Amino acid sequence: GGILNQCIHNGFGLHTFKEELTGPEYAARYITQALERKIEYKLNTMVLSISKDKHITAVNREEGLIEIDARAIILTMGCRERSRGALNIPGYRPAGIYSAGTAQRLVNLEGFMPGREVVILGSGDIGLIMARRMTLEGAHVKCVAELLPYSGGLKRNIVQCLHDYDIPLLLSHTVVDIHGRERLEGVTLAEVGPDRKPVPGSEKYIPCDTLLLSVGLLPENELSEGAEVTLDRVTGGPAVNESLETNVPGIFACGNVLHVHDLVDYVSEEAARAGRAAAKFVRGGTPKSARVVKLTGRDGVRYTVPQTVRPAAMGESVVVRFRVANPYYGKYLSCYVDGERISHRKKQIMAPGEMESFTLTREALGESAKEVVFCVEEE
Protein backbone atom coordinates (compact mmCIF):
# COMPACT_ATOMS: atom_id res chain seq x y z
CA GLY A 1 0.00 0.00 0.00
CA GLY A 2 0.91 3.65 0.14
CA ILE A 3 1.93 6.21 -2.46
CA LEU A 4 5.65 5.27 -2.43
CA ASN A 5 5.01 2.29 -4.76
CA GLN A 6 4.31 4.63 -7.68
CA CYS A 7 7.01 7.21 -6.83
CA ILE A 8 9.76 5.59 -8.89
CA HIS A 9 11.80 8.82 -9.10
CA ASN A 10 14.78 9.32 -6.79
CA GLY A 11 15.24 11.88 -4.03
CA PHE A 12 13.96 9.86 -1.07
CA GLY A 13 16.00 9.02 2.02
CA LEU A 14 18.56 11.84 1.94
CA HIS A 15 17.85 12.72 5.58
CA THR A 16 16.97 9.27 6.96
CA PHE A 17 19.51 7.02 5.22
CA LYS A 18 21.97 9.66 3.93
CA GLU A 19 21.60 8.29 0.40
CA GLU A 20 19.30 8.88 -2.55
CA LEU A 21 16.65 6.20 -3.09
CA THR A 22 13.53 5.73 -5.20
CA GLY A 23 10.15 5.47 -3.47
CA PRO A 24 9.89 1.65 -3.65
CA GLU A 25 13.50 1.30 -2.39
CA TYR A 26 12.76 3.61 0.53
CA ALA A 27 9.61 1.65 1.42
CA ALA A 28 11.50 -1.66 1.13
CA ARG A 29 13.94 -0.56 3.86
CA TYR A 30 11.05 -0.24 6.33
CA ILE A 31 9.26 -3.37 5.07
CA THR A 32 12.46 -5.33 5.81
CA GLN A 33 12.62 -3.86 9.32
CA ALA A 34 8.97 -4.77 9.97
CA LEU A 35 9.52 -8.36 8.78
CA GLU A 36 12.68 -8.74 10.88
CA ARG A 37 10.70 -7.70 13.97
CA LYS A 38 7.89 -10.14 13.05
CA ILE A 39 5.28 -7.39 13.23
CA GLU A 40 1.82 -8.70 12.33
CA TYR A 41 0.09 -7.02 9.38
CA LYS A 42 -3.04 -7.40 7.26
CA LEU A 43 -2.95 -6.64 3.52
CA ASN A 44 -5.96 -5.85 1.29
CA THR A 45 -7.88 -4.83 4.40
CA MET A 46 -10.26 -1.86 4.39
CA VAL A 47 -11.06 -0.09 7.65
CA LEU A 48 -14.75 0.87 7.58
CA SER A 49 -14.95 2.78 10.84
CA ILE A 50 -13.15 3.76 14.05
CA SER A 51 -15.11 4.67 17.18
CA LYS A 52 -14.16 7.06 19.95
CA ASP A 53 -13.53 4.11 22.29
CA LYS A 54 -10.98 2.74 19.76
CA HIS A 55 -13.17 0.00 18.26
CA ILE A 56 -12.10 -0.75 14.67
CA THR A 57 -14.38 -2.34 12.06
CA ALA A 58 -12.53 -3.61 8.97
CA VAL A 59 -13.14 -6.03 6.11
CA ASN A 60 -11.05 -8.28 3.84
CA ARG A 61 -11.60 -11.28 1.55
CA GLU A 62 -10.00 -13.89 3.82
CA GLU A 63 -11.61 -13.06 7.17
CA GLY A 64 -14.70 -11.12 6.13
CA LEU A 65 -15.78 -8.54 8.72
CA ILE A 66 -13.12 -7.95 11.40
CA GLU A 67 -13.72 -6.30 14.79
CA ILE A 68 -10.67 -5.07 16.74
CA ASP A 69 -10.62 -3.39 20.14
CA ALA A 70 -7.39 -1.40 20.33
CA ARG A 71 -5.70 0.29 23.24
CA ALA A 72 -3.97 2.77 20.94
CA ILE A 73 -4.48 3.69 17.28
CA ILE A 74 -2.12 5.60 14.97
CA LEU A 75 -3.86 7.28 12.03
CA THR A 76 -1.74 7.08 8.86
CA MET A 77 -4.31 7.36 6.07
CA GLY A 78 -2.33 9.90 4.05
CA CYS A 79 -4.09 12.35 1.76
CA ARG A 80 -6.03 12.44 -1.50
CA GLU A 81 -5.88 14.78 -4.47
CA ARG A 82 -8.29 17.63 -5.01
CA SER A 83 -10.39 16.74 -8.05
CA ARG A 84 -11.64 18.68 -11.08
CA GLY A 85 -15.04 18.98 -9.40
CA ALA A 86 -13.54 21.19 -6.70
CA LEU A 87 -12.23 23.66 -9.32
CA ASN A 88 -15.50 24.53 -11.11
CA ILE A 89 -13.83 24.69 -14.55
CA PRO A 90 -16.47 25.13 -17.31
CA GLY A 91 -16.66 22.68 -20.21
CA TYR A 92 -17.62 19.10 -20.94
CA ARG A 93 -16.19 16.01 -19.26
CA PRO A 94 -14.12 14.40 -22.03
CA ALA A 95 -11.58 11.61 -21.62
CA GLY A 96 -8.04 12.84 -20.99
CA ILE A 97 -8.45 14.75 -17.72
CA TYR A 98 -6.57 13.13 -14.83
CA SER A 99 -5.27 14.06 -11.44
CA ALA A 100 -1.45 14.02 -11.52
CA GLY A 101 -1.34 11.09 -9.06
CA THR A 102 -3.68 8.99 -11.23
CA ALA A 103 -1.49 9.67 -14.28
CA GLN A 104 1.57 8.76 -12.19
CA ARG A 105 0.00 5.41 -11.33
CA LEU A 106 -0.99 4.73 -14.95
CA VAL A 107 2.51 5.45 -16.27
CA ASN A 108 4.69 4.02 -13.48
CA LEU A 109 2.67 0.99 -12.33
CA GLU A 110 0.17 0.07 -15.06
CA GLY A 111 2.34 0.92 -18.06
CA PHE A 112 -0.29 3.05 -19.84
CA MET A 113 0.38 6.39 -21.50
CA PRO A 114 -2.42 8.87 -20.66
CA GLY A 115 -1.71 11.09 -23.69
CA ARG A 116 0.82 12.74 -25.96
CA GLU A 117 0.15 16.50 -25.82
CA VAL A 118 -0.05 17.50 -22.17
CA VAL A 119 -0.99 20.61 -20.18
CA ILE A 120 -0.55 20.53 -16.40
CA LEU A 121 -2.61 22.76 -14.09
CA GLY A 122 -1.00 23.40 -10.71
CA SER A 123 2.66 23.37 -9.75
CA GLY A 124 2.55 21.08 -6.72
CA ASP A 125 5.37 18.56 -6.41
CA ILE A 126 3.38 15.74 -8.07
CA GLY A 127 2.57 17.97 -11.04
CA LEU A 128 6.21 19.00 -11.46
CA ILE A 129 7.43 15.40 -11.20
CA MET A 130 4.81 14.26 -13.73
CA ALA A 131 5.90 17.01 -16.15
CA ARG A 132 9.33 15.37 -16.17
CA ARG A 133 7.99 11.80 -16.26
CA MET A 134 5.67 12.49 -19.22
CA THR A 135 8.56 14.15 -21.09
CA LEU A 136 10.83 11.16 -20.42
CA GLU A 137 8.08 8.81 -21.67
CA GLY A 138 7.88 10.70 -24.98
CA ALA A 139 4.98 13.10 -24.43
CA HIS A 140 5.17 16.82 -25.17
CA VAL A 141 4.39 18.87 -22.05
CA LYS A 142 3.28 22.24 -23.40
CA CYS A 143 3.26 24.10 -20.09
CA VAL A 144 2.60 24.02 -16.37
CA ALA A 145 0.02 26.66 -15.37
CA GLU A 146 -0.18 27.92 -11.77
CA LEU A 147 -2.97 30.11 -10.37
CA LEU A 148 -0.72 31.72 -7.75
CA PRO A 149 2.19 34.10 -8.48
CA TYR A 150 4.61 31.47 -7.09
CA SER A 151 5.03 27.71 -7.38
CA GLY A 152 3.68 25.40 -4.69
CA GLY A 153 6.47 22.85 -5.14
CA LEU A 154 10.00 22.41 -3.85
CA LYS A 155 12.63 24.61 -5.53
CA ARG A 156 14.60 21.43 -6.27
CA ASN A 157 11.68 20.02 -8.28
CA ILE A 158 11.14 23.26 -10.23
CA VAL A 159 14.78 23.19 -11.36
CA GLN A 160 15.12 19.44 -12.00
CA CYS A 161 11.68 18.85 -13.56
CA LEU A 162 10.92 22.05 -15.47
CA HIS A 163 14.08 24.09 -16.09
CA ASP A 164 16.18 21.05 -17.07
CA TYR A 165 13.58 20.06 -19.70
CA ASP A 166 12.67 23.59 -20.90
CA ILE A 167 9.05 23.22 -19.79
CA PRO A 168 7.41 26.67 -19.38
CA LEU A 169 5.93 27.55 -15.97
CA LEU A 170 3.12 30.08 -16.38
CA LEU A 171 2.53 31.76 -13.02
CA SER A 172 -0.76 33.62 -12.36
CA HIS A 173 -2.52 31.53 -15.04
CA THR A 174 -5.40 29.09 -14.88
CA VAL A 175 -7.63 26.95 -17.12
CA VAL A 176 -10.89 28.76 -17.84
CA ASP A 177 -12.39 26.37 -20.42
CA ILE A 178 -12.09 22.75 -21.49
CA HIS A 179 -12.74 21.82 -25.14
CA GLY A 180 -13.80 18.48 -26.58
CA ARG A 181 -16.70 16.10 -26.03
CA GLU A 182 -15.42 12.54 -26.33
CA ARG A 183 -11.69 13.26 -25.97
CA LEU A 184 -9.99 16.41 -24.74
CA GLU A 185 -9.08 18.62 -27.71
CA GLY A 186 -7.64 21.66 -25.96
CA VAL A 187 -7.86 24.06 -23.05
CA THR A 188 -8.18 27.83 -22.77
CA LEU A 189 -5.70 29.43 -20.38
CA ALA A 190 -6.10 32.94 -18.99
CA GLU A 191 -3.98 35.20 -16.86
CA VAL A 192 -5.39 35.98 -13.40
CA GLY A 193 -5.16 39.23 -11.45
CA PRO A 194 -4.32 39.77 -7.77
CA ASP A 195 -7.92 38.74 -6.94
CA ARG A 196 -7.24 35.38 -8.68
CA LYS A 197 -9.97 36.07 -11.26
CA PRO A 198 -9.29 35.73 -15.02
CA VAL A 199 -8.20 38.93 -16.77
CA PRO A 200 -10.57 39.58 -19.74
CA GLY A 201 -8.76 39.48 -23.06
CA SER A 202 -5.82 37.39 -21.79
CA GLU A 203 -7.28 34.04 -22.91
CA LYS A 204 -5.26 31.78 -25.19
CA TYR A 205 -6.20 28.39 -26.64
CA ILE A 206 -3.73 25.52 -26.30
CA PRO A 207 -4.46 22.30 -28.23
CA CYS A 208 -3.79 19.18 -26.13
CA ASP A 209 -5.19 15.69 -25.54
CA THR A 210 -4.39 15.45 -21.82
CA LEU A 211 -4.87 17.75 -18.82
CA LEU A 212 -3.22 16.78 -15.54
CA LEU A 213 -4.43 18.42 -12.33
CA SER A 214 -2.00 19.03 -9.49
CA VAL A 215 -4.17 21.38 -7.47
CA GLY A 216 -3.60 20.41 -3.87
CA LEU A 217 -3.82 17.53 -1.45
CA LEU A 218 -6.45 16.96 1.24
CA PRO A 219 -5.72 14.89 4.38
CA GLU A 220 -7.99 11.81 4.36
CA ASN A 221 -9.85 12.23 7.66
CA GLU A 222 -13.28 10.66 7.25
CA LEU A 223 -12.33 7.85 9.67
CA SER A 224 -10.96 10.44 12.12
CA GLU A 225 -14.26 12.30 12.13
CA GLY A 226 -16.08 9.05 12.93
CA ALA A 227 -13.90 8.77 16.04
CA GLU A 228 -14.81 12.38 16.99
CA VAL A 229 -11.24 13.57 16.47
CA THR A 230 -11.00 17.38 16.36
CA LEU A 231 -9.58 18.64 13.04
CA ASP A 232 -7.50 21.78 12.46
CA ARG A 233 -9.31 23.96 9.92
CA VAL A 234 -6.04 25.12 8.30
CA THR A 235 -4.18 21.80 7.93
CA GLY A 236 -7.31 19.68 7.42
CA GLY A 237 -5.72 17.12 9.76
CA PRO A 238 -6.19 16.32 13.45
CA ALA A 239 -5.13 18.84 16.08
CA VAL A 240 -2.39 17.12 18.12
CA ASN A 241 -0.13 17.63 21.12
CA GLU A 242 3.64 17.10 21.46
CA SER A 243 3.12 13.30 21.38
CA LEU A 244 1.08 13.61 18.15
CA GLU A 245 -1.95 12.52 20.19
CA THR A 246 -5.37 13.84 19.16
CA ASN A 247 -8.09 15.08 21.50
CA VAL A 248 -9.20 11.43 21.85
CA PRO A 249 -6.79 9.75 24.33
CA GLY A 250 -4.93 6.89 22.68
CA ILE A 251 -5.55 8.01 19.07
CA PHE A 252 -2.41 9.42 17.42
CA ALA A 253 -1.78 10.78 13.91
CA CYS A 254 1.28 11.26 11.68
CA GLY A 255 2.27 11.83 8.07
CA ASN A 256 0.07 13.36 5.39
CA VAL A 257 -3.16 12.63 7.28
CA LEU A 258 -1.88 15.13 9.87
CA HIS A 259 -0.60 17.80 7.46
CA VAL A 260 0.80 17.63 3.93
CA HIS A 261 4.57 17.03 3.86
CA ASP A 262 7.11 17.66 1.11
CA LEU A 263 9.74 15.12 2.27
CA VAL A 264 9.06 11.48 3.14
CA ASP A 265 11.97 11.61 5.61
CA TYR A 266 9.94 13.97 7.80
CA VAL A 267 6.98 11.58 7.58
CA SER A 268 9.16 8.71 8.84
CA GLU A 269 10.50 10.90 11.64
CA GLU A 270 6.95 11.81 12.67
CA ALA A 271 5.81 8.17 12.43
CA ALA A 272 8.58 7.04 14.81
CA ARG A 273 7.56 9.79 17.21
CA ALA A 274 3.90 8.71 17.10
CA GLY A 275 4.90 5.04 17.49
CA ARG A 276 6.97 5.75 20.60
CA ALA A 277 4.15 7.83 22.10
CA ALA A 278 1.53 5.13 21.37
CA ALA A 279 3.73 2.44 22.98
CA LYS A 280 4.21 4.67 26.01
CA PHE A 281 0.44 5.23 26.22
CA VAL A 282 -0.29 1.48 26.11
CA ARG A 283 2.21 0.89 28.93
CA GLY A 284 0.55 3.65 30.98
CA GLY A 285 3.59 5.90 30.88
CA THR A 286 1.90 9.11 29.71
CA PRO A 287 1.57 11.62 32.57
CA LYS A 288 -1.72 13.42 33.15
CA SER A 289 -0.45 16.95 32.60
CA ALA A 290 -2.51 19.86 33.88
CA ARG A 291 -0.65 22.60 31.99
CA VAL A 292 -1.19 22.86 28.26
CA VAL A 293 0.64 25.47 26.15
CA LYS A 294 -1.06 26.59 22.93
CA LEU A 295 1.01 26.95 19.73
CA THR A 296 -0.21 29.27 16.97
CA GLY A 297 1.04 30.94 13.80
CA ARG A 298 0.27 34.50 12.71
CA ASP A 299 1.60 37.28 10.45
CA GLY A 300 2.79 34.97 7.70
CA VAL A 301 2.83 31.59 9.48
CA ARG A 302 -0.27 29.60 8.46
CA TYR A 303 -0.30 26.86 11.11
CA THR A 304 1.84 24.85 13.52
CA VAL A 305 2.05 21.12 14.21
CA PRO A 306 1.70 20.26 17.04
CA GLN A 307 -1.02 22.72 18.04
CA THR A 308 -0.43 22.24 21.81
CA VAL A 309 2.38 20.98 24.05
CA ARG A 310 2.36 19.71 27.63
CA PRO A 311 5.70 20.71 29.20
CA ALA A 312 5.57 17.79 31.66
CA ALA A 313 5.26 15.27 28.79
CA MET A 314 7.46 16.79 26.08
CA GLY A 315 10.95 15.74 27.17
CA GLU A 316 13.77 18.24 26.67
CA SER A 317 12.45 19.59 23.36
CA VAL A 318 9.89 19.12 20.60
CA VAL A 319 10.16 19.83 16.85
CA VAL A 320 7.45 22.23 15.63
CA ARG A 321 6.73 22.19 11.88
CA PHE A 322 4.84 24.87 9.95
CA ARG A 323 4.45 26.60 6.58
CA VAL A 324 4.52 30.26 5.66
CA ALA A 325 1.61 31.88 3.80
CA ASN A 326 3.65 33.59 1.03
CA PRO A 327 7.20 33.63 -0.32
CA TYR A 328 9.45 35.80 1.86
CA TYR A 329 12.98 37.01 1.08
CA GLY A 330 15.42 38.25 3.73
CA LYS A 331 12.76 38.24 6.46
CA TYR A 332 12.99 37.08 10.09
CA LEU A 333 11.29 34.04 11.59
CA SER A 334 10.42 34.81 15.21
CA CYS A 335 9.10 32.84 18.16
CA TYR A 336 7.33 34.49 21.10
CA VAL A 337 6.48 32.88 24.45
CA ASP A 338 3.71 34.84 26.19
CA GLY A 339 4.69 37.96 24.24
CA GLU A 340 8.42 37.69 24.92
CA ARG A 341 10.61 37.00 21.87
CA ILE A 342 12.87 33.98 22.43
CA SER A 343 14.10 33.48 18.85
CA HIS A 344 14.69 35.81 15.89
CA ARG A 345 16.35 34.15 12.87
CA LYS A 346 16.99 35.74 9.49
CA LYS A 347 15.98 33.50 6.57
CA GLN A 348 17.20 34.25 3.05
CA ILE A 349 14.10 32.63 1.58
CA MET A 350 10.92 31.06 2.91
CA ALA A 351 8.32 29.57 0.57
CA PRO A 352 4.88 27.96 1.11
CA GLY A 353 6.08 24.85 -0.75
CA GLU A 354 8.91 24.20 1.74
CA MET A 355 8.11 23.24 5.32
CA GLU A 356 9.90 25.11 8.11
CA SER A 357 10.81 23.68 11.51
CA PHE A 358 11.73 25.00 14.94
CA THR A 359 13.05 23.13 17.98
CA LEU A 360 11.10 24.34 21.03
CA THR A 361 12.78 23.52 24.35
CA ARG A 362 11.04 22.88 27.65
CA GLU A 363 13.41 25.38 29.23
CA ALA A 364 12.06 28.14 26.96
CA LEU A 365 8.53 27.48 28.21
CA GLY A 366 9.50 28.05 31.84
CA GLU A 367 7.05 27.33 34.64
CA SER A 368 4.03 29.34 33.54
CA ALA A 369 3.94 29.78 29.72
CA LYS A 370 0.46 29.73 28.21
CA GLU A 371 1.02 30.51 24.51
CA VAL A 372 3.77 30.23 21.89
CA VAL A 373 3.42 32.29 18.69
CA PHE A 374 5.44 31.93 15.46
CA CYS A 375 5.47 34.81 12.97
CA VAL A 376 7.38 36.42 10.10
CA GLU A 377 8.86 39.87 10.81
CA GLU A 378 10.53 42.55 8.69
CA GLU A 379 13.41 43.10 11.15
Task: Identify the residue ranges that each predicted region occupies.
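A Rossmann-like FAD-binding core segment of flavoenzymes
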Residues: 34-58, 68, 135-222, 316-349
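Beta1-alpha1 glycine-rich phosphate/pyrophosphate-binding loop at the start
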Residues: 1-29, 105-108, 114-160, 344
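Residue-level detector of alpha-helix initiation sites
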Residues: 79-81, 124-126, 218, 258
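Short, aromatic- and glycine-rich surface loops/edge beta-strands on solvent-exposed regions
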Residues: 320, 333-335, 360-379
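FAD-site-proximal beta/loop scaffold in flavoenzymes
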Residues: 75, 97-107, 210-261
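FAD-binding core/adjacent interface of flavoenzyme oxidoreductases
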Residues: 27-117, 191-201, 212, 239-240
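A conserved FAD-binding loop/helix module that cradles the flavin
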Residues: 254-304
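Surface beta-strand/loop "capping" patches
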Residues: 287-328
